[in-house]
Regions:
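Conserved glycine-rich Rossmann-like NAD(P)H-binding loop of the short-chain dehydrogenase/reductase
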Residues: 31-45
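The beta1-alpha1 cofactor-binding region of Rossmann-like NAD(H)/NADP(H)-dependent oxidoreductases
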Residues: 40, 59-71, 111
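A short, exposed helix-loop element centered on a Lys and neighboring polar residues
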Residues: 129-130, 174
Length: 261
């Protein structure tokens, strides 16, 4: 499949879970993909699995110097970036390993854990977009897709700092849209639904509990997403919040190929 015909896509947090599924779907549809992640070895392995159209990049989205270096690597390899997928994130299990069975009140959350989640998700989105947008404006256009969560998760009991981080991404995305109005750079928010097999959920959580997080009509398990049939769907990549249908791989290729009007 060459639906995306060589467009240049940088995916953060692309070494596992949803990020890996998005990278695989994009590569299968013909995109050139930069697989970015904190662990250099995992990034190299993940990129190798996607084939010659993918290149790895070690990236800590919280670190401005790391962000600048990763964008520079993409420019050196491709000459530009057509699409940025801000997917990198840290789940609740790093703050409270038993968050599903024993919600932790916000006043018991360690400040260091709060900062780590928020800096990875919100500050990371900001730093990546801040570095990429001037490049996209100079080249005549581009797309940014910020991965967030549904509103119910944002305000769920015991979901500090994960919920506030998602809310921050949504607010940041809306400001990006306003600031980029009239340009050819578009911004979307993608809401994937339950992350049941991505490392976000503790290993001891039973399958029944995982199943409750995942609506088959909305999203498939991550290891199946790259195999789903991708359909080209027109989208309006501006103010809309996109809900994944038939798998996040479908949604990502749809956004990548949609008309910018």
């Amino acid at each position: 499949m060459t639906e995306l015909n060589g467009i240049r896509v940088l995916v953060t947090g692309a070494t596992s879970g949803l990020g890996a599924a998005m990278a695989a779907a994009l590569a299968a549809a013909g995109a050139r993909v930069m697989v970015a992640g904190r662990d250099e070895a995992r990034a190299k392995t993940a990129a190798a699995e996607l084939g010659p159209s993918a290149i790895p990049c070690q990236l800590d989205v919280r670190d401005e110097r790391s962000v600048v270096a990763c964008i520079a690597r993409a420019r050196e390899a491709w000459g530009g970036i057509d699409m940025l997928v801000n997917n990198a994130g840290i789940g609740m299990r790093t703050v409270n390993p038993r968050f599903m069975s024993e919600p932790q009140p916000f006043w018991e959350v360690a400040p260091s854990g709060f900062r780590d989640v928020v800096e990875t998700k919100v500050v990371g989105c900001f730093l990546m977009a801040r570095e990429v947008v001037p490049l996209m404006l100079r080249q005549g256009g581009g797309r940014i897709v910020n991965i967030s969560m549904n509103e119910q998760t944002m305000v769920r009991r015991g979901f500090v700092p994960y919920g506030p981080a998602g809310a921050g991404v949504e607010a940041l995305s809306r400001v990006m849209v306003a600031d980029l109005a009239g340009s050819s750079v578009t911004v979307n928010i993608l809401l994937p639904g339950g992350a049941t097999r991505t490392g976000m959920i503790p290993d001891e959580v039973p399958d029944e509990a995982r199943a409750a997080l995942l609506d088959p009509a909305v999203m498939g398990p991550p290891d199946r997403l790259a195999c789903l049939r991708r359909r080209r769907r027109r989208a309006r990549p501006s103010h809309r919040r996109d809900r994944v249908q038939r798998g996040i791989g479908d949604a990502m290729t749809a956004l990548a190929s949609a008309s910018p009007t």
